Amino acid sequence: MKFKVIVDSCGELTPEMKQDERFASAALTLEVGADTIVDDETFDQADFLRKVAAYPECPKSACPSPEIYQKGFETDAEHLYAVTLSSELSGSYNSAELGKNLVLEEHPEKKIHVFNSKSASVGETLIALKIQECEEAGMEFEQVVETVDAYIESQHTYFVLENLETLRKNGRLSRVKALVASALKIKPVMGSTPEGSICQLDQARGINKALVKMVDYVKEREPHSSDKVLAICHCNCPERAQMVKEALLERMQVKDVIILDTAGVSSMYANDGGIIVVI
């Protein structure tokens, strides 16, 4: 095997990636009250969303241990990569770096690189697919790293939340503001900063108007999109994801489109009805 990519479980894998031994997932764990949930193939989104809705505090996540990454890197692949959730949002990047160093202490000849996605969810998915594209084009390890780093810098993440409870529970939105926003049906349009943290771009009354604003932002910020892959991730709302896809494709050209359902960590952030767009 020439290369292997480990993606932490905030990044959803496509069905094809799940069947490809060159891709692996490093599971984060989620805590809702006394319940500990592993974000792997056993994750039950509907059950998780019910638990989150019923629990008064914000769910918590714990990143994969360095040993999990270490074990993932202990393979005969020539080139090894990890793609993690933004280091501004999680300790997964630091954990992967520690896992890499544990392997290099024993095998200094190995070629391993950890990418800080500065994104989340399908942003990580697209980065993993970019690594595959570079490897299959026959690039040297150092050229893959350079090309993918440049791709990460060009990538933008956007999302709209139907449900503001996670923002309220984690303190990003006060209870009063959350109540007012919910009463007025105000939905925030969010995005990523260049450093990989979260910012509010805009807001609108009603989910559909917020989605239109998000589409406007994507179109405005991506004038040269014809060679890019568009990725959309939804939390339990496939029809909404399809609507966003159609609205974007009416206004811009892209190379391909991927639509996936949120796994565990992304479900925690997006909550029921949330939409994430990365390009």
Predicted regions: what is each one?
Residues 2-63, 68:
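N-terminal glycine-rich anion-binding loop in soluble enzyme alpha/beta folds
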Residues 4, 10-24, 29, 89-92, ...:
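Mixed-charge interfacial surface used for oligomerization/domain docking
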Residues 60, 82, 114, 231-232:
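Short catalytic-loop micro-motif centered on adjacent basic/acidic residues
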Residues 64-80, 84-106:
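Active-site cofactor/cluster-binding pocket
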Residues 76-77, 107, 225, 252:
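A structural signal for short coil/turn segments at secondary-structure junctions
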Residues 84, 111-118:
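A ubiquitous short alpha-helical element
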